UniProtKB/Swiss-Prot annotation:
This is Dehydrogenase/reductase SDR family member 7C. The gene is dhrs7c. Substrate binds at T178. InterPro entries: NAD(P)-bd_dom_sf (IPR036291), SDR_fam (IPR002347), SDR_family_member_7C (IPR052148). The keyword Oxidoreductase applies. The active site is at Y191. The lineage of its organism: Eukaryota, Metazoa, Chordata, Craniata, Vertebrata. Its EC number is 1.1.-.-.
Length: 311
């Protein structure tokens, strides 16, 4: 009996693994087929995540409108996409020069985006401005700049695109946010505030447009790592406090997040957290045991000051 168990258990594990793999591949292929011919707008397409989103949606057969504030980088992305794509199953992306923080020009930009294909099926809000530092050292001017880039700009674009989705009774609006839209991290006050604001806006938006068959989704990783930058051992960025909010050792890779965005769009998921159990637990602890959460946060801040004083 023991020998049979020794043989059966590995085979059972292997069989289950095979079934899971096949299921994931089927879901992935269905996700891509569901996006063929869809008009997908990606803001800040020239960022690391923007490029990966452009790649996966382009290969899925979507009609892309790529937005960014540097024309040369948009053209380079355009050339990179068409150089590796099969022209018989993909569409040539259209480009729109867009600075998401330029609120006064957003209505005109929304019209230009609409005019690319006559409609928008999916709007992916990917643009974001990051900042860290003690809150008392951040000027009000910089606070406003961050709010323009992370909140006022994106919602102004949403308001420009939304009426057309409502009139067609179809569409999906996606926000690539961060877990800092749910919990605040010290020394990122302005950034966390902007992310809380945009999260609240999307939560309200979801309820208000459901009757018009417009879907609203948020994808929130702990943070998205760059391709090249990694924290140096021993510094504050690599400390136990960073571990508390990470997805992987150095955050979620743009490729991983882009695939999740693709899955979220095709399956119309409402909210996705890309996080390991520790930051997931932090969100719930903040809600149900706030005193404990605040104590842990304060301990992390004290640890930082202690390390700096020792240096």
């Amino acid at each position: 009996m023991g020998f049979l168990t020794f043989l059966i258990v590995p085979l059972l594990i292997l069989g289950i693994s095979g079934i899971v793999y096949i299921y994931r591949e089927v879901v992935r292929l269905m996700s891509r087929s569901a996006l063929k011919n869809k008009v997908v707008v990606i803001t800040d397409a020239i960022s690391g995540l923007g490029k990966e989103c452009s790649r996966v949606f382009h290969s899925a057969g979507a009609r892309l409108v790529l937005c960014g504030k540097t024309w040369e980088k948009l053209e380079a992305l355009h050339d990179a996409l068409i150089s590796v794509a099969d022209p018989s199953v993909t569409f040539t992306p259209k480009l729109v020069l867009l600075d998401i923080s330029d609120i006064n020009n957003m209505e005109a930009m929304g019209k230009e985006i609409q005019d690319c294909y006559g409609c928008v099926d999916v709007l992916i809000n990917n643009a974001s401005m990051k900042m860290k530092g003690p809150l008392q050292s951040v000027s009000l001017e910089l606070d406003k700049k961050i709010m323009d880039a992370n909140y006022f700009g994106p919602i102004t674009l949403v308001k420009a695109i939304l009426p057309h989705m409502i009139s067609r009774r179809t569409g999906q609006i996606v926000l690539v946010n961060t877990i800092q839209g749910k919990i605040g991290v010290p020394f990122r006050a302005a950034y966390a505030a902007s992310k809380h604001a945009i999260q609240g806006f999307f939560d309200c938006l979801r309820a208000e447009v459901e009757e018009f068959d417009v879907s609203v989704s948020t994808v929130s990783p702990t943070f998205i790592r760059s391709y090249h930058v990694q924290p140096q051992p021993g510094n504050w960025e690599a400390s136990i406090w960073k571990f508390f909010f990470r997805k992987l050792s150095y955050g979620a890779h743009p490729v991983e997040v882009a695939e999740e965005v693709l899955s979220t769009v095709s399956r119309k998921k409402q909210e996705v957290f890309m996080a390991n159990p520790i930051p997931r637990a932090a969100v719930y602890i903040r809600t149900f045991l706030p005193e404990l959460f605040f104590a842990v946060v304060a301990t992390g801040v004290k640890e930082k000051h202690f390390v700096e004083e020792e240096k």
